């Protein structure tokens, strides 16, 4: 029985036609001596009517069917009786008068109800992923993902980009997250790594003269997982030669503008807002601020610098700051102030100073230390109005802004502050090129070692590297970092200088990155690019709570696949072939003894 149509495609124009359909039994109803079957495939649902007067054999078969059985049918399209139409589905004006049914495959009783409105245990969903993927939401997510990636490809091809695949088996360069490593059978004792990104290859492609490259790249990182992380993930990887930062911004902004309009009929405004890393931290306490909330950080260091409080004096002596958040039209209760205070302490802060402006008077947890001049300055500078409140904390700059950045979102939840609807894109620029890692006690790259310093800061590489700003940028959407990019270093001497600051010896640099350094000696053009997380973008656009809801076959937070059982042990022969001997941790060894 050869299929002629998809279930969801049939409409009133097909009345009178004979059709052949295949799909899953979505629902069965017996009514008035007839059997009604909702038949489902990827395109939608159509109603079948099985009448014994037309085909007793088909009726007998239909009487044995169960939900999720796979069947094929032949029949005639007819208009539904008046008053029996279903406007909720595209096929609601018609039904199929069944003449023949063929059972392709029965189904066992389902381990969970695919169509329940109740939340389904994710462990069960992942174990029976082939069933979970039949659900409307999952089908919609995966199909939207396909359409989004197709739209990206079309847009970039029209703008002169060439899609080029880069290798999955590469040399290990353990900077940043851990690599997944793969033993070589042909080269005993040597290993490949799976790429954390195609970074080095896309730079090589610019040296090769391809000018504009892109790839829907699979990337791999062996790191501890969270709700927004997967060990294998997909990114839109791009690189362009002879560009400035604004050229890259322009391409990405128009990519989103075109794609969102075509796929979702959403209009977005370009160019996206731009703020520096320092502005983002000072205003929002985060380098990926959620602009849907208006809560901003205010600096009151200057106002409070003469307060006779020991902790303020000692904070300012150490070049600390005093910053806080205004709560417009909110006067917290004692309990609510206590919740905020406890959260600050939980985040390793030293407590809060709070202020409320009610009945024309500024009340505060430190009222006895405030003179009228200080109160008036606070009211005027913060533009406090009747019914407003303010709280602040003192400490080292980075500590204070990070605490307030976390509190900003928790306060929005505590006081039910509504977030604005829509997509709020933002470029964050001018990150530091380096940061000091307290645990490792060394300077590390803020993004990666191939990011170019700003031209005016190049002299600081020799004198004060922690003050060097980078030609890099992050794209943020609704508080989620979609990806990072930068103008790259394309001169060997600057790249070597950066490696030296990062304590990568010339020997290590040659071993790990020698091919790139050598390529720079053969006419490397200025170039830059970006990588955007496809999984994260799709999760936001489909309003999904987890990346696992937009990936067909995701891993759990422990990095396992509940469907296939990966990772698994392998037999000893396979290990011998790649010259590997497994040394178990002590606990595992004891279990096996």
UniProtKB/Swiss-Prot annotation:
The lineage of its organism: Bacteria, Pseudomonadati, Dictyoglomota, Dictyoglomia, Dictyoglomales. ATP binds at residues 221-223, 230, 481, 533-536. This is Aspartate--tRNA(Asp/Asn) ligase. SUPFAM superfamilies: Class II aaRS and biotin synthetases, GAD domain-like, Nucleic acid-binding proteins. The record marks 31, 83 as: Important for tRNA non-discrimination. It comes from Dictyoglomus thermophilum (strain ATCC 35947 / DSM 3960 / H-6-12). L-aspartate binds at residues 175, 221, 447, 488. Belongs to the class-II aminoacyl-tRNA synthetase family. Type 1 subfamily. Aspartyl-tRNA synthetase with relaxed tRNA specificity since it is able to aspartylate not only its cognate tRNA(Asp) but also tRNA(Asn). Reaction proceeds in two steps: L-aspartate is first activated by ATP to form Asp-AMP and then transferred to the acceptor end of tRNA(Asp/Asn). Its main location: cytoplasm. One of its GO terms (molecular function) is aspartate-tRNA(Asn) ligase activity. Its EC number is 6.1.1.23. Residues 199-202 are annotated as: Aspartate. It is found in: Cytoplasm. One of its GO terms (biological process) is aspartyl-tRNA aminoacylation. Keywords: Aminoacyl-tRNA synthetase, ATP-binding, Cytoplasm, Ligase, Nucleotide-binding, Protein biosynthesis. It is an enzyme of class 6 (ligase).
């Amino acid at each position: 029985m050869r299929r002629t149509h998809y279930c969801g495609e049939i409409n009133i124009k097909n009345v009178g036609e004979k059709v052949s359909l295949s799909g899953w039994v979505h629902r069965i109803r017996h009514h008035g001596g007839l059997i009604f079957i909702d038949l489902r495939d990827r395109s939608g649902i159509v109603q079948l009517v099985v009448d014994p007067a037309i085909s007793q054999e088909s009726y007998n078969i239909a009487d044995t069917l169960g939900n999720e059985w796979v069947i094929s049918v032949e029949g005639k399209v007819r208009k539904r009786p008046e008053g029996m139409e279903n406007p909720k589905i595209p096929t609601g004006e018609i039904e199929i008068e069944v003449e023949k049914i063929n059972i392709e495959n029965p189904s066992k009783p389902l381990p969970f109800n695919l169509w329940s409105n109740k939340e389904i245990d994710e462990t069960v969903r992942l174990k029976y992923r082939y069933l979970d993927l039949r659900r409307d939401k999952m089908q919609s997510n995966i199909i939207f993902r396909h359409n989004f990636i197709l739209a990206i490809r079309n847009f970039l091809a029209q703008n002169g980009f060439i899609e080029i695949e880069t290798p999955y088996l590469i040399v290990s360069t353990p900077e940043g997250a851990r690599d997944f490593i793969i033993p070589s059978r042909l080269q005993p004792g040597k290993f490949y790594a799976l790429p954390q990104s195609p970074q080095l290859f896309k730079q090589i492609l610019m040296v090769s003269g391809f000018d504009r490259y892109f790839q829907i790249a699979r990337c791999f990182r062996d790191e501890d997982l969270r709700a927004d992380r997967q060990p294998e993930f997909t990114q839109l990887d791009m690189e362009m030669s002879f560009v400035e930062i604004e050229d890259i911004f322009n391409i990405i902004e128009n990519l989103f503008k075109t794609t969102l309009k075509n796929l979702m009929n959403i209009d977005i405004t370009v160019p996206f807002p731009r703020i520096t890393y320092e502005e983002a931290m000072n205003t929002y306490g985060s380098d990926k601020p959620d602009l849907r909330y208006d809560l901003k950080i205010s600096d009151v260091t200057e106002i409070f610098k003469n307060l006779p409080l020991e902790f303020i004096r000692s904070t300012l002596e150490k070049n600390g700051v005093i910053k806080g958040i205004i709560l417009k039209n909110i006067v917290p209760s004692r309990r609510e102030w206590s919740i905020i205070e406890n959260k600050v302490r939980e985040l390793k802060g030293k407590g809060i100073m709070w202020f409320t402006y009610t009945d024309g008077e500024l009340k505060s947890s430190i009222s006895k230390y405030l003179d009228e001049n200080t109160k008036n300055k606070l009211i005027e500078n913060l533009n406090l109005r009747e019914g407003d409140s303010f709280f602040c904390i003192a400490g080292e700059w980075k500590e204070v802004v990070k605490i307030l950045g976390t509190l900003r979102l928790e306060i929005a939840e505590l006081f039910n502050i509504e977030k604005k609807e829509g997509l709020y894109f933002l470029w964050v620029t001018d990150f530091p090129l380096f940061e000091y890692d307290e645990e490792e006690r060394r300077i590390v790259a803020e993004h990666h070692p191939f990011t170019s310093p700003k031209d005016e800061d190049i002299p600081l590489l020799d004198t004060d590297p922690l003050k060097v700003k980078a030609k890099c940028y992050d794209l943020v959407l609704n508080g989620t970092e979609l990806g990072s990019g930068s103008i790259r270093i394309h001169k060997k001497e600057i790249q070597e200088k950066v490696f030296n600051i990062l304590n990568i010896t010339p020997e290590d640099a040659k071993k790990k990155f020698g091919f790139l350094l050598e390529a720079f000696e053969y006419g490397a053009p200025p170039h830059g690019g970006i990588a955007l997380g496809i999984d994260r973008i799709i999760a936001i656009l489909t309003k999904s709570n987890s990346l696992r809801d937009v990936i067909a076959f995701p891993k759990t937070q422990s990095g396992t696949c509940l469907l296939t059982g990966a990772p698994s042990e392998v037999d000893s022969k396979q290990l011998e072939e790649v010259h590997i001997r497994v040394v178990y941790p002590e606990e595992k060894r004891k279990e096996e003894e």
